[in-house]
C-alpha cells in the first residue's frame, strides 16, 4: 500500500476520519454528502453500478462528484479534478437539496441568543 494511503478499517469514528481525510473515494453512500460539507474532493467509484439493485435517491449526474465505474476512469477523474468547478457544483447541489448551511450556524445562534438576552435585560 502507498505511504499516502492509510487503512483505517478498524477505526471507530467515521466523523473523525472525514475531518482528517484530504479526499474521499466512496460508492453511493451518504458519506459523500457529509464529506462535501468541507468542500474537499469526493469521488464516486462504483464498478458494480449496472447491477446496483437497491435503488438510488439520486443518479450520479445529479451529484457534484465525479463518477467512475472503472479504476482507469477513477484515476482520470482524480488527475483532472478542478476545484473551482467542484465548488460551484457543490453549491448547486446544496441548493438542489435545500441545504442552507454556510459554515456560520454557530455565529448566527450566538447572535440570536445575544439579542434575546440583551432584550431581556432591557425590560
Label each region the model flagged.
Residues 1, 30-98:
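Catalytic binding pocket for nucleotide-activated donors in carbohydrate/polymer assembly enzymes
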Residues 1-33:
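Donor nucleotide-activated moiety binding/catalytic core segment of transferases
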Residues 6-9, 66, 98-101:
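Pocket-edge positions in alpha/beta enzyme catalytic cores
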Residues 12, 69, 104:
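Residue-level signal for the nucleotide or nucleotide-sugar donor/cofactor binding architecture
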Residues 16, 72-73, 108:
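An acidic, carboxylate-rich microenvironment
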Residues 20-23, 80, 115:
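Residues within well-ordered alpha-helical secondary structure of globular protein domains
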Residues 102-123:
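C-terminal alpha-helical cap of glycosyltransferases
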